[in-house]
Each structure stands twice: as structure tokens, then as C-alpha cells.
Amino acid sequence: GTLGFGLMPLLQEYEVVVIVNTSSDDGKIVGDIDVLSGDELIANQGIKKTANEVEITEMLQICSMANHCAQTSMVSIVPEDIISVHVGVTPALREKWTEYIDVIVDELAKCGINSTRKEFVMGLDEILDQFANPSIEHGKGF
């Protein structure tokens, strides 16, 4: 999920914010990937089916009335089930995962954010395991 009102200071402090998310768009099929600008989200092109989606749109609307709001975009992918709470990636999303990462990296580049592939790359299963089982051990978990 997102930070709710905790998202507001990030939108006001930074020049660029790229939100990586899931989307509950019933008009799309599982694995569809979209990139929407903050303006598109504010104009209600962002779906507001879940609390997560409502929070993003509302924080963008509120921050757009302030002195500063980051140039915002959201890269989202449509999961099979957006309501259930669990950590994992379904086979349908695994098939699209590399494309999803590529779209995210492309969006970062469009925003002037350079990324460099790490020499050692964790596998998706290891990332999910560390997310599901956070640790305070240095370099492990979040």
C-alpha cells in the first residue's frame, strides 16, 4: 500500500516522484502495464477502487493546490487479485515482470533519473521473501 497522508511531504519535498503500483482497472487484463502522469491521475483517469488508489489520487489533488507538487507519474500493473493481502507474484505477473521493470526504468530515465544495474541482482523470490520477513540485520530486509 501507499503512505496515505505520509505521501504528501514526499510530493512537496521532491522535484520528481515515480510511484510503482498495482491497478484495479476492470477494463484491463492481468499483466497490462500503464504509465499515468500526476495530471492524468488528478483528472480521474486513475482508478479509485482500492484505498491505495484513492490515497494516491487524493494526495496528488491536495498537493496540486500547494505551492509545490512534484512532477509525478505512476507505473502500474494489473494483478489477478488486488483485494487479497499477501506477498507474492502470480505466474501471469511473473511472465510480465521483466517488461514491468523495463517500463519502470524507462519512466525513471524520462524523468531524468539514471539507474545502473547492480553487479549482483537478487532474484524476485528472494526479494519477496525479505519483504515478507523483514530483518534488522544489516543489508537484509527493509
Question: What is each stretch, according to the model?
Answer:
Residues E58-G139:
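Phosphate-binding/catalytic loops
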Residues T22-T72:
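Helix-loop-strand module that forms the ligand-binding subsite of alpha/beta enzymes
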Residues G1-V16:
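Catalytic-core regions of hydrolytic enzymes
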Residues G1-T2, V20-T22, G38, I77-V78:
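Fold-independent oxyanion-binding glycine-rich loops
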Residues Y14-S24:
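Short N-terminal helix-initiation segments at or just after the protein's N-terminus
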Residues Q12-Y14, G31-V35, G88-P91:
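Short, glycine/charged-enriched secondary-structure capping and boundary segments
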